[in-house]
Amino acid sequence: MRLLIDDEFLELTDADMAWLYLGSGNESKVYKYGDEVLKIYNQNCGKLRLDQETASKLSNIYTYRLLLPKRIIRDADNGEFLGYTTSFIRRASTTGIIRMKMFDFLCELDLLREDIKTLNSSSVEVEDFNLNNTAYDGRIYLVDPGSYVIRRTPEAIRFLRSCNSKVLNDYVKNDIFGMAKLSAVKQRSVANMFDEYDYIGDMIRETAKDDESVRQYVKRMAR
């Protein structure tokens, strides 16, 4: 495969591609390249893909925890837009997340909120989140802004009373992130206004203890 990554020429053999391969989905295949990930769209992914113009715009926006496109990937022979690069973050299980101290966890939610505000101020609307697309290395990152789905709204949040490990992990993944209320952030048709009337991180902060873990917090609140 012959690629142009911005202005950098890169030629990869099938063996190279197999060595660098990280995984794939309905939308794309991803490969590790230095400190970046190459996201190369599948030919049949259709409307799921970002177009080159959108990817280029996002690459010029700085965010803390939303991993946006960094460089544009094109076919070196015909110039066709193939995908983009983003920062490589080594993933960890949700076990690491539920062991985070609440102070650190809430700071991460605050940074995610700031990222959404930054995108909103640049006239970029994030409609879909997929909370399975998280990367954790002591910090929490959300990957692929084109494929996110918020699982719950604050009105639907409930504290689970059965706090075994599997249920707790699912709760943290599906509900706690939803409590960041990222889904409330929408581009306004007239003025770009960030809606944080129900940013639930503030509500959690009122009941959380800085030195307890996310697991301890959930168990305490579920009593």
Language model features with spans:
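C-lobe/activation-segment region of protein kinase-like
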Residues: 125, 137-223
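Conserved protein kinase catalytic core
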Residues: 45, 93, 150-152
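Conserved hydrophobic "DFG−1" position in protein kinase catalytic cores
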Residues: 32, 88, 135-136
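Conserved kinase catalytic-core helix
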Residues: 95-136, 140-141
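Short acidic-glycine loop/turn motifs at beta-strand connectors
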Residues: 34, 75-77, 137-139
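ATP-binding glycine-rich loop module of kinase domains
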Residues: 2-3, 14-73, 97
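Ser/Thr/Pro/Gly-rich, low-complexity intrinsically disordered stalk/linker tracts of secreted
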Residues: 6-9
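Conserved structural core of kinase catalytic domains
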Residues: 64-109
